[in-house]
Amino acid sequence: MKNTVTTFQKAKNNGEKLTMLTAYDYSTAKLIDESGINGILVGDSLGMVCLGYEDTLSVTMEDMIHHTRAVSRGVKNTLVVGDMPFMSYQSSVYDAVVNAGRLIKEGGATAVKLEGGATVIEQIKAIVNAQIPVMAHIGLTPQSINVFGGFKVQGKDEEKAQKLIEDAKKIEEAGAFAIVLECVPAKLAELITKAVSIPTIGIGAGAGCDGQILVYQDMLGMFSDMSPKFVKKFADVGELMKDGFKAYIKEVQEGTFPSKEHCFKIDESVLDKLY
């Protein structure tokens, strides 16, 4: 079944949990799509897990379009959400609409995601008015890492918790179809989920959200030096890959690979004529 923004809303209405993962390339997107997931986020997290940056701030629109286009080619039934990178929407409403349009038209995404609450309401409204579905993102917003002073849980005191609830309501009123809640106390995330009629997608926000999202490299255990508290390792792919790499190196060095079964043949009479 093809997943759309309507699918997301129906899931919330019916009490069905939504599932999302990140993807950044064709082959990964194809595998995730075949697994039956609801949505893929082509996140600006690619800056850290694919490009090796320390944060997401250096990711460009060209980066996002390039990776979103690859992911879009790999899916058949999954909703593809393209992340709007730092300074692609904060500077003006005009820039927000133009860049959102590029992720749809050039990247092949179905929807876009942008970070922020009350400060980006006008951008959300304008993008929605341009007939582009918007997924919002509040709580820990990685593009604001310099303001937060690091990757920290958000909404732990009354004032900040209340602001998150109010932001969620304003986001819904602006026309967004879903909200990502990142690194928010579980009980607060549950309150926000009940306060809005659109789906909430949690990452480090407890099981009370309408759905969950993780960075696929994290949940597959691909990086031993990156292990956020909220991540469960569903497979140990990193170690499996290293074992495979080591086995390949060993067999090449020993001369056991490639063996006859991996080689192509030529008639000996042809060889005789070459000398």
Swiss-Prot record:
Single GO biological process annotation from the record: pantothenate biosynthetic process
Cofactor(s) the protein needs: Mg(2+)
Keywords: Cytoplasm, Magnesium, Metal-binding, Pantothenate biosynthesis, Transferase
UniProt main location, coarse: cytoplasm
Record: active site: 182
One GO cellular component term: cytoplasm
Pathway named in the protein's UniProt entry: Cofactor biosynthesis; (R)-pantothenate biosynthesis; (R)-pantoate from 3-methyl-2-oxobutanoate: step 1/2
Coiled coil (UniProt feature): none
GO MF annotation: an example: 3-methyl-2-oxobutanoate hydroxymethyltransferase activity
Binding site for 3-methyl-2-oxobutanoate: 44-45, 83, 113
Keyword Ribosomal protein: no
EC number(s) per entry: 2.1.2.11
Family: Belongs to the PanB family.
Role summary: Catalyzes the reversible reaction in which hydroxymethyl group from 5,10-methylenetetrahydrofolate is transferred onto alpha-ketoisovalerate to form ketopantoate.
Oligomeric form and interacting partners: Homodecamer; pentamer of dimers.
The protein's name in its UniProt record: 3-methyl-2-oxobutanoate hydroxymethyltransferase
Classification lineage: Bacteria, Bacillati, Bacillota, Clostridia, Eubacteriales
Gene name, Swiss-Prot/TrEMBL: panB
